[in-house]
Regions:
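C-terminal "cap" of GNAT-fold acetyltransferases
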Residues: 19, 78-91
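Conserved GNAT acetyl-CoA-binding A-motif
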Residues: 48-57
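Short, small-residue-biased leader/transition segments that mark boundaries at the very start
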Residues: 1-6
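Conserved donor-binding loop and adjoining core beta-sheet/short helix segment
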Residues: 7-16
Length: 91
C-alpha cells in the first residue's frame, strides 16, 4: 500500500485559491518515480476542485524543486524559508 512507500502525503489549503501538495518518501523509494506519480495525482485533484497547486520546499531540496518545474510549476519566490512553486490550474 501507499504506507509502504510514503511516510506522508501533503494536501491541504494553502490559500483561498490553492492547495499545497507534497510527499515524504521512504529513502528506499527515492528516484523511482513515486514523487512524480504523487504530484500527478494531487495536481489532478486540485484541478478537479478548481484550485491552483503549490509545492513548497527548502532550497536544499533540489529534487523536489526539479519535480515542481518538470510538472509545469513556476517559481514564485521564498516564503518562511521555503521556495514556493505554483501551478495555475483553477477553472
Amino acid at each position: 500500500g501507499l504506507g509502504d512507500v510514503y511516510k506522508r502525503q501533503i494536501y491541504h489549503d494553502y490559500d483561498e485559491y490553492s492547495r499545497e501538495l507534497g510527499w515524504v518518501l521512504k529513502p528506499a523509494f527515492w528516484h523511482k518515480g513515486y514523487a512524480d506519480e504523487m504530484t500527478d495525482l494531487l495536481t489532478a485533484l486540485a484541478r478537479r476542485e478548481g484550485k491552483n497547486a503549490v509545492i513548497e520546499c527548502v532550497p536544499e531540496q533540489t529534487a523536489s524543486a526539479h519535480i515542481a518545474r518538470r510538472h509545469g510549476f513556476s517559481y514564485e519566490g521564498r516564503a518562511d524559508g521555503c521556495d514556493v512553486y505554483r501551478l495555475r490550474c483553477e477553472k
